[in-house]
Amino acid sequence: MSVVSSVTVKVPGTTANLGPGFDCIGAALTIYNQFQFTRLETSELIIQATGAEAERVPTDESNLLYQAFVKLYQYIDQTPPGVKVEIELGVPLARGLGSSATAIVGGLVAANRLAGEPLSQAQVMELAIAIEGHPDNVVPALVGGCRLAATGAMGWEICDVPWHGDIVPVLAIPDFELSTSEARRVLPTEYSRADAIFNTAHLGLLLRGLQTGKGEWLRAALQDKLHQPYRQALIPGYDAVNTAAVAAGAYGMVISGAGPTLLALADVSHAAAVAAAMSTAWREAGIKAVVRSLALDTHGAT
């Protein structure tokens, strides 16, 4: 078997939760990080990063991308080679768009390819979930599409969620950060039965709305009582941006992942107006934001 000397992995950013699907549903988006690993003759580690906020990327063994790379080699009981790692950043850091998931998936996939692909995609997925701690970002980052994950008797069960072609994800990405740990600290440790039932019903409605593109279902579905009511206060201007998005024709707006990025779903005919309205609302609130209309990535890590 020939030894591969260099691999390049392109991994999509993701949006998780989609309102009522807290910690169990996520979708891959057409925004990417790219990672190139080149095998070295020595045990040296070289990490170089370019793109937005590249100066913040660790260039030593604490780098999450490299840690995932090493984790796979440990799993297959091999010593990781020295590598030069070149990172091209397209997914904003700490904005609720799965930047850490791109690193985990990128490191695992690159290691698997350099090692001759000893692990199946399902095994790589299990490792990714174990590292991240939850499936909603790493699963769509690896396999693409919109995915629902649940634990079964034999491990994780992953379900493809059909996404109607007329549904456009519109992202408003502010110039401030919100860490996942901070966003989790504000959540209660217990919920009422009524709130659990509310989210169960709305997640079911969301799945059907995404499949059919039916506006009435989507407008009702994008509600949540488990995480968003507690996190909204951490995002200045949330109410104004939400009001503007809905007034411009969005089905609704949710927090992308742990935030602070806000995600609106709209049909093709309203997407541009929704994007403009969200941008204006945040600007009037004194916050700079980049607003992008994206699409569902259906390939995952390539």
UniProtKB/Swiss-Prot annotation:
Location relative to the cell: Cytoplasm
UniProt keyword annotations, A-Z: Amino-acid biosynthesis, ATP-binding, Cytoplasm, Kinase, Nucleotide-binding, Threonine biosynthesis, Transferase
Pathway field: Amino-acid biosynthesis; L-threonine biosynthesis; L-threonine from L-aspartate: step 4/5
Chief subcellular location: cytoplasm
GO cellular component: cytoplasm
GO MF term set: ATP binding; homoserine kinase activity
InterPro entries in alphabetical order: GHMP_kinase_C_dom, GHMP_kinase_C_sf, GHMP_kinase_N_dom, GHMP_knse_ATP-bd_CS, Homoserine_kinase, Ribosomal_Su5_D2-typ_SF, Ribsml_uS5_D2-typ_fold_subgr
Catalytic activity: L-homoserine + ATP = O-phospho-L-homoserine + ADP + H(+)
Annotated protein name in UniProt: Homoserine kinase
Organism expressing this protein natively: Trichormus variabilis (strain ATCC 29413 / PCC 7937)
Source taxonomy: Bacteria, Bacillati, Cyanobacteriota, Cyanophyceae, Nostocales
Originating gene: thrB
